[in-house]
């Protein structure tokens, strides 16, 4: 069996995260880790060294932008798919400014998510 890519899913919605993780394991054969806030995300990034970060805009406390800014300041390079239910021009522009690989507006299908993950894995842009 080929080596499974590691995905960190950072979203405070536990029910949605469980559904997404199950779908990613089945459809994409990924090893999925979950974090529900900024602190857990930071710890999981360093512990698991995932290939792709799925990051929700509305994380508790300071939010997804703060996580991205923190990673950028620390020089941490990872392909990031920024998930948002508020895909305004400002949100999308800021996500790309902070080095998001892709912005995925919610709601999205599992198929669309798997496609974006494969795109991120093929991309030269972390």
Predicted regions and their residues:
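Alpha4 helix (beta4-alpha4-beta5 surface) of REC/receiver domains from two-component response regulators
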Residues: 66, 87-102
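Short amphipathic alpha-helix used as the core "switch/output" element in two-component signaling
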Residues: 65-76
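Active-site beta3 strand of CheY-like receiver
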Residues: 48-54, 59
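Acidic catalytic/metal-coordinating carboxylates
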Residues: 37, 63-66
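C-terminal output helix
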Residues: 108-118
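Two-component/phosphorelay signaling modules centered on CheY-like receiver
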Residues: 14-33
